[in-house]
Amino acid sequence: MSNKEIEDNEDVWKERCMNCIRCNDEKNCGTCWPCRNGKTCDMRKCFSAKRLYNEKVKRQTDENLKAIMAKTAQREAAHQAATTTAPSAPVVIEQQVEKKKRGRKKGSGNGGAAAAAQQRKANIINERDYVPNRPTRQQSADLRRKRTQLNAEPDKHPRQCLNPNCIYESRIDSKYCSDECGKELARMRLTEILPNRCKQYFFEGPSGGPRSLEDEIKPKRAKINREVQKLTESEKNMMAFLNKLVEFIKTQLKLQPLGTEERYDDNLYEGCIVCGLPDIPLLKYTKHIELCWARSEKAISFGAPEKNNDMFYCEKYDSRTNSFCKRLKSLCPEHRKLGDEQHLKVCGYPKKWEDGMIETAKTVSELIEMEDPFGEEGCRTKKDACHKHHKWIPSLRGTIELEQACLFQKMYELCHEMHKLNAHAEWTTNALSIMMHKQPNIIDSEQMSLFNKSQSTSSSASAHGATTPISSTSSSSSSSSKNDDEMEDTAEFLANLAVQKEEETQNN
C-alpha cells in the first residue's frame, strides 16, 4: 500500500497502543480535514498505528497459512487413504459399449450440466472461501519446505550415547540412551570438569582470569568515574551561574530607566519567518516573532504520561491529554511563570556582553565557568522599549536548561555503561560461564611453565581422592561420532584422567 492509501485507510488508525499522548486524548480538535469529513482526527492518530496494523496483517496471514496447511494435510491424508484401500491390480470389466448418437439424451438439459459443474466445484478446495489474503510464492515454498522437514525420516545411522560408560545407541532425537546417562554425564561435568576449569580460571598469576578481567575493566571504570565527576562539576557550575543571574537581577530592580526610547524608521519592513507575513514594521518585529512562535508551539503537544523529577522541564499536568508537559521550563509558552524579572523597569542586559569585554568566553560553557559573567552595569533602557535585548533572561535560562538536559542524558548513558560493566564482571565469574567458555589463552613461556607446574601439583594432590577411571574399552567404543561441544568437554576430561593415571604409575 502507498502512503496515501495508508493515510486514507481507517482500519490503520483504529489500532491503539494506549501509551502515547494521542491515544489518551479523548477529544477531537474539530479543525483538521479528517474531523470535518467524519474520520479519525489527526491529533488522535496513534504514533504506533502503522506498526500495529502491519503486525495484525502479518498475524492474519500466518493464520491463513496455517489453515492452508491444515486443508492440504487433510486432502493428502484422504488421497493416501484412498490409494491404500484401492486394489493393487486394476480389474478390467468388459462392458458393452454403446454407440454414440447425435443430439442430446432425452430428459437431459442444462440442469445436468449445472449439477456436474457444482459437483466438480465441491470436489475442488477453494482457498478463497476461507483465506482473505492468499500467500505469495515464497510463503508457499516455505510451507512446503517446513512440511518436508517435519515429515522427514530420522537418521538411518544410529548414534552412540554420549555417556563414556555407556555402549548403547541413543534414543531418537536425543543424545543419550536414557535419562540416567544424561544425569550421570552432567554430574561428571560438575565434579570433574568444573573444578579443573575453576583452578585454571582463578590461577594466581598474571594470566589468571580475575586478574585479566580486572585489568580489562579497571581502566574503563576509571574513565567512567572521571566523566561522572566532570559532569557533576558542570552541573554545580550551572547552578552557581543561575544563582549569579538571580543576584544580578536583584541589583537591577532598584534602577530607573535613562535616555530616550529607541525608535526605528517607520519605512522599514521585514517578513516573518514563522507565519510568512511580508510587511511587518521593524519596530514590532521581535514581538511579532515571539507571538508567532508561541502560537505554533501551543498547536503542538509535547507531553508524556510519566512525570520526571527533573528541574528543567515544565511538568505541568494537562487533564485534556492526560499527560505532563515536556517543554523547557523557561521557554514554555503555556505554563511559564515569571520570576523576579517581571518587576524590572529597565532592560538589564549586561553592558559587559554588549561592549565585547568577554572575548575569552566564546561558548556557553566558557561563560558559565567565568567568575564574574555579568559585571555590575546593565542596559538602562526601558524594558518594554528595548528592541535589542528582547526577553534575554528567559532565553538565557532556556539555554542553561537545555545544557542541563544534555548533561542528564550523558549521565544516564554513563550509568548504563557502568551497569553493563558490572553485569559483565558478575557473569564472567559465574560457574555457568566458566563451564561454557574455554580456558584463558597463555602465550608467554614463563606463564606456561608456571601454569603446567601448578597443574601437575594439583593433579598429583587430587590423585588420591580421584574416582575409578573408566575402562579403555568403553572409552574407545564411545570415541566415534563425538563432534559437538559436550564431546569436547568429555575428551578433555578423559585426557586429564589419563595424565593422572600416568603420574600415579610413575610415582609408584
UniProtKB/Swiss-Prot annotation:
InterPro entries attached to this UniProt entry: CpG-bd_C (IPR022056), Spp1/CFP1 (IPR037869)
TM region positions: none
Report the subcellular localization: Nucleus
- Where does the record place Low complexity bias? 113-123, 454-481
The GO cellular component terms are:
Set1C/COMPASS complex
This protein's major location comes to nucleus
Flavoprotein listed as a keyword: no
Give the start-end ranges of region Disordered: 95-156, 453-508
Give the record's keywords alphabetically: DNA-binding, Metal-binding, Nucleus, Transcription, Transcription regulation, Zinc, Zinc-finger
Enumerate the residue ranges forming zinc fingers (CXXC-type): 10-47
Q: Which domain of life is it from?
A: Eukaryota
Per the record, the GO terms for biological process are:
positive regulation of DNA-templated transcription; transdifferentiation
Question: Which GO terms fall under molecular function for this chain's record?
Answer: DNA binding; methylated histone binding; zinc ion binding
According to its UniProt entry, the function of this protein is described as: Transcriptional activator that exhibits a unique DNA binding specificity for CpG motifs; enriched at promoters containing the trimethylation mark on histone H3 'Lys-4' (H3K4me3). Forms part of the SET2 complex and interacts with the SIN3S HDAC complex at promoters. Required for H3K4 trimethylation and plays a repressive role in the expression of heat shock and salt-inducible genes. Required for fertility, in cooperation with class I histone deacetylases (HDACs).
Q: Which PANTHER family match?
A: CXXC-TYPE ZINC FINGER PROTEIN 1
Subunit and partners: Component of the SET2 complex (also known as the SET1/COMPASS complex), which contains at least set-2, swd-2.1, cfp-1, rbbp-5, wdr-5.1, dpy-30 and ash-2. Within the complex, interacts with wdr-5.1, ash-2 and dpy-30. Also interacts with the SIN3S complex, which contains at least sin-3, hda-1, athp-1 and mrg-1. Interacts with sin-3, hda-1 and mrg-1.
How is this protein named in the record?
A: CXXC-type zinc finger protein 1
* Taxonomic lineage from the root: Eukaryota, Metazoa, Ecdysozoa, Nematoda, Chromadorea
Underlying gene = cfp-1
